[in-house]
Amino acid sequence: MKLGILGAGGIASTMAKTVAGMKNVEAYAVAARDLERAQVFAQKYEVKKVYGSYEEMLADDEVELVYIATPHSHHYLHAKMCLEAGKHVLCEKAFTVNAEQAQKLFDLAKEKKLLITEAIWTRYMPSRKMINDIIESGVIGEVTAVTANLSYTVSHVERIRKPELAGGALLDVGVYPINFASMVLGDKVKDVKATAIFQNGVDILDSIAMVFEGDRMATLQCGAREISDRMGSIFGTRGYMQVQNINNPEKITVFDTEHKEVASYVVPEQISGYEYEVESCMKAIQEGKLECPEMPHAETIRIMKILDDIRKSWNYEIPWIE
């Protein structure tokens, strides 16, 4: 399968390096608004075709699947362009800036009979099944609570610090702890409360409490100005487990009620972790599906609505959207 990469930044580089180590897919084309930047990218990662505009790449009949690696403020526009050009789409998180945009893209993809999915990579990783298998084994009993945190020192980055780019920690970083909690506790959310510290009009430190059906709770934190331990903890009636790095799980450790380690698991060796979402897209496309089972459209919409509600509770309005 021939992959076109839309954007030539850091995550685009990771995708190009990942695809180079995969079978049955090639990084065939790259497009950037700056042709010279795209040329440097293509030379570095041995990408065959180079384009100085997104429109030119989308006019290339050889491109089958497009990976959107631009800021999330532009995801809706760029994904719409791809679909209208007849391309399948793997779009980075946050999928869009709100649920309304996401639904429009899903409706268009259905009309065009094209696959589109959100590249929230933790949904596709083997660690997800590993965590679920441990829970289902009953070793930690009934799961009643989850905590997770993820923070990076990225408040200086343009896409984070500018309200007009839908900036802030929530859409860029907060999607990971929210998805982590949802993968463990499910989709029956009864209540969400969130507080935030704002700087220059965007949230830079967020605390989120989610109450799920069955009297279960997730307590989450994300930030853009500090470093956190990236830990995810899942608590049960007979023990608990800790997931090292919720953004790219490395190790899962299980403890009993006496806080003694009873098991430890290391995730399988991987290229980068991006390969799983690409493999899922290829399989779905080959099977004629319009979504990936790891991140169905309904789940993207559900998460986007949670993000919308949180932002609304803060009176955080994106200037060009609301």
Enumerate the language-model features and the residues they cover.
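Active-site loop of classical SDR/Rossmann-like NAD(P)-dependent oxidoreductases
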Residues: 267-279, 295
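Predominantly a Rossmann-like dinucleotide-binding segment in NAD(P)-dependent oxidoreductases
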Residues: 122-193, 198, 317
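Beta-loop-alpha module in the N-terminal Rossmann-like domain of NAD(P)-dependent dehydrogenases
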Residues: 15, 48-108
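N-terminal Rossmann-like dinucleotide-binding module
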Residues: 1-45
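Hydrophobic residues in well-ordered beta-strands that form the structural core
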Residues: 51, 91, 116-118, 147, ...
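Contiguous beta-strand/loop segments that form the cofactor/metal-binding neighborhood of enzyme cores
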Residues: 179-251, 268, 279-289, 321
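Rossmann-fold dehydrogenase core element
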Residues: 103-121, 142-146
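C-terminal helix-rich "cap/oligomerization" subdomain common to oxidoreductases
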Residues: 65-67, 213, 280-322
